[in-house]
Amino acid sequence: MKYLLILLFLFSNHSFAEESLNKYTINANGNVEIIEEHKYSNTHSFKNYTITGTFEDNLGNYGSHSIAVIAEYKEDNVINLQWSSKLIYQNNKVIFAQGVRKKGIDEAGVGKAILFSGEKPLNVLNNTECNYAIKFIKNNVFTKWLCNISEKNLNILKNIN
């Protein structure tokens, strides 16, 4: 019975901690520029490209971003894709993100990202893991990031200028 109570306590605390997290979203758009492409065969290729554009979060913050991407494709599917992003907020403060995508089609997919090396006050986002979805139309890209952050950090981000 004692162990059951301990387990119940741990699970209730875990649930409470999850409930105290808030959704932080970033919508980003940009243009793709292919730097280098290697066609290994008709169905296998490598691309190195950049994406530059703008973003806005669900708190009204906004800015510009630049992304460097390396990707390998086989039969129009992503085999491996890695990227690094620099986000510059309206207050000229910078935070970086890196992400990966291991599967999906060339035109769309989902992956994981982590935010890091943020300048104050963006440093409250350091080590925040996010899920992202991306889709392409010609040379245009649309992304949505979904992150969970604490109420305290959400309030800090509401007040950046």
Q: Predicted regions: what is each one?
A:
Residues 3-12:
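Sec-dependent N-terminal signal peptides
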Residues 18-161:
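Beta-strand-enriched cores of mature, soluble protein domains
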